[in-house]
């Protein structure tokens, strides 16, 4: 069995698993139709920044989309903090994470009604902030393109 002490873990659908074992079905509505919502915040000094505010906004978005995450805001907060805690040992001093919560309506039944209720897909994960890889953007700036076609 592989040594997983150097692999980040992720919460997915009720379990905390190594990232290498975290799978989302290709039939998940978020993959097929973009039918999902997410929120992301970062850590400062290994603490999640304004998590309560982010989760309130996230749950407001879920309500607007009529998407039930299958858990309370308090439970999502608890999971977010646990996932972070289980991944902190992988950071060096001065490094931090993005912490993301993602919810979709889940996997729709093949040949079924697209409005049929499914179990939501819920993911909470941490990704290291790429400070070193992006330092040159802060130092040198970056080119951008502004399309002439305006969207409303």
How does the language model describe each region?
Residues 1-152:
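Conserved alpha/beta cores of soluble small-molecule-handling proteins
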